Amino acid sequence: MKKVRKSFVLLLTGLLAVLILSACGQKTQQDIVAGLDEKAKEYTSYKAKAKMTIETGSEPQVYNVEIWHKKPSLYRVYLENPKKDQNQVILRNENGVFVLTPSLNKSFRFQSDWPNNSSQVYLFESLVKDVQNDSDAVFTAKEKKYVFETKTNYQHNKMLPTQEITFNKKDMSPSSVKVMDTDRKVMVKVEFSSFEFNKQFDKESFDEKKNMTLSQMDVATSAKPSDTFAVKTPLELPLGVKLLEEKDISTEDGKRIIMTYGGEKSFTLIQEKAQIAKASSSVTLNGEPVNLGYTIGALSDASLSWTYDGVDYLLSSKDLSKEEMVTVAKSMQGQSSK
């Protein structure tokens, strides 16, 4: 009888131990968020590579992205569109925030809080922040991944309210990000191919002049923009706004198209062939870099400028909000009959 009782006690103890160990192995959502927070605090730097696909316009835009970050505030994001033979670099260093366009030997310098002012799909600390800030985030644990569905924090784009962020269980690094519109259609997808924490950088890694020179080696800077270009018109306009006038002006470098829109609100849209600067030039703006889906633009209170496919664009308005300017620019995929 004593042997039976002893065996029963041992069996019960073993079962309890298994249950306790099993319970300990099942981490809660709060545990994972705490783990992400700890990871965000402990790393000193990282390097990552990813493919970013943006479903805007008539066809998807695919970018190769390389991300460098060194705490507390050094950033380098290299964006390459192989199909268009076009690249841009977003830098943040002690001199400010820069958007470099190496193929044109041009750069914009911003007085900006980028990247802290909105969600950034390719920055680890921004993704962790979005998870932490959403008390209603939906969490799913998979075999090798942790998946969060959270709200986004885009200042000038309310049409992309939701994102799905997937982290690797092994080291908490991001695996993928899917940003969805109000119909839950994936509009932006980032797939990380590599992510390494605590990497070493030299002193020139985040220098604007050094990055301009290195990036120029990756594009055919000797290839001049075409003398002609297809004039584009926005596919999305604010309610009650229409095209009032279109002027074609001859310049030393070709033509300049000036479109005037009016109605409930008004704005002017200028398009002209982009010129390669003879010497590296930098323009300082009181604004911020903004992702238009197919290129990085320079956004201020009353204007939005960008370069794409060898053409310079300038949208200026005292009536449109920043969000409206971004919406108009993002829809510049239509072709006029010119």
Swiss-Prot record:
Induction: Expression is controlled by a sigma-E-regulated promoter which needs the sigma-E factor for the binding of the RNA polymerase and subsequent transcription.
Record membrane topology: Single-pass membrane protein
Compartment(s): Cell membrane
Superkingdom of the organism of origin: Bacteria
InterPro entries in the record: LolA/LolB/LppX, Sporulation_related
GO cellular component terms given for this protein: plasma membrane
Primary localization: membrane
Alphabetical GO biological process terms: sporulation resulting in formation of a cellular spore
TM region positions: 8-25
UniProt entry keywords in alphabetical sequence: Cell membrane, Membrane, Sporulation, Transmembrane, Transmembrane helix
Function summary: required for efficient sporulation.
The name this protein goes by in its record: Sporulation protein YdcC
Species for this entry: Bacillus subtilis (strain 168)
Gene: ydcC
